Amino acid sequence: MRLFSIPPPTLLAGFLAVLIGYASSAAIIWQAAIVAGATTAQISGWMTALGLAMGVSTLTLTLWYRVPVLTAWSTPGAALLVTGLQGLTLNEAIGVFIVTNALIVLCGITGLFARLMRIIPHSLAAAMLAGILLRFGLQAFASLDGQFTLCGSMLLVWLATKAVAPRYAVIAAMIIGIVIVIAQGDVVTTDVVFKPVLPTYITPDFSFAHSLSVALPLFLVTMASQNAPGIAAMKAAGYSAPVSPLIVFTGLLALVFSPFGVYSVGIAAITAAICQSPEAHPDKDQRWLAAAVAGIFYLLAGLFGSAITGMMAALPVSWIQMLAGLALLSTIGGSLYQALHNERERDAAVVAFLVTASGLTLVGIGSAFWGLIAGGVCYVVLNLIADRNRY
């Protein structure tokens, strides 16, 4: 794979996937680390370890299967840790990470998760993905309210470029946005320090009570809110890869990196959609290049873990929101079409879409999981009724 031979839109898709992933949740990771009692140096080490783990897993799986397999930390899992790690020592937190990732590996080895994912209808997977991504589209246009000049200009340039050179529309929007941000003086880079940071090994401390109260919920949240949507998103995009090996590999890698602060590495859904979209590459079989590029950017982000938070703080939130919305627009539209195309499955797909988009959280598990459950129940009930009426 030669970077110079990869089309610019494909390079941009890989870059945006990493940028949006970090921008949307890096702060939550830092907050969870602070709750665990980590020092600034240790937190930087966590970010380094996470970047390296995601980079290695993304590159390995993508190059091996030649499909866009993007991995990511579990944002819902990080949010759970913000409250779950309160009262625990840093060593106990590391013990929780190890138990969680060991459970993920066990789940992958048994094949239970793969069998579950095979029975999910394509329309429900697409509806869930559309529900996950909807907020990014809404945030993009809501950002016009506070930053009309910046976001309005990005939108107009995107529209004009989309009409004449569709593959370069997001690039053009990003460039004009950067120009306006610099012109307005909205970039503050004083906190950005580009210096490689080595991860710090932390001795784990295991507790049965903490395994039940924190590790088990973290395992469930990671599988239900990260891996399930990630596999379903890949399925909705028309890609197939053996589920169990994906889960086992990411779980094992996270297990190895756990003593350095990696609490989980799962299959990405939101950011993966950028690499799986037509904007990444018109040829569906070449979109794996975008994920491979994302893997390289993950590694770079890992090498400079201490600079990540400063970089995210330097960019206006509205710029990131508009860029994310524009990059995901085609994927949202395509997912909605796939979800609603089959009239017999339409009602169940709408339920899955709305529950997922609602942001519902029950027993610490996010709306993507409950969207699949609600849509699945509707699918089974409505199809049973339809079959009974037919006979």
UniProtKB/Swiss-Prot annotation:
Residues 1-9, 64-93, 145-167, 222-246, 309-311, 383-391 are cytoplasmic. Keywords: Cell inner membrane, Cell membrane, Membrane, Transmembrane, Transmembrane helix. The chain crosses the membrane at residues 10-30, 43-63, 94-114, 124-144, 168-188, 201-221, 247-267, 288-308, 312-332, 362-382. GO terms for molecular function: benzoate transmembrane transporter activity. Its main location: membrane. It is a multi-pass membrane protein. GO terms for cellular component: plasma membrane. Pfam families: BenE. Signal peptide: none annotated. Residues 31-42, 115-123, 189-200, 268-287, 333-361 are periplasmic. The keyword Cell membrane applies. InterPro entries: Benzoate_Transporter. It comes from the Bacteria. PROSITE patterns: HTH_ARAC_FAMILY_1. It is found in: Cell inner membrane. PANTHER family: INNER MEMBRANE PROTEIN YDCO, MFS FAMILY TRANSPORTER, PREDICTED SUBSTRATE BENZOATE. NCBIfam families: benE. This is Inner membrane protein YdcO. The gene is ydcO.
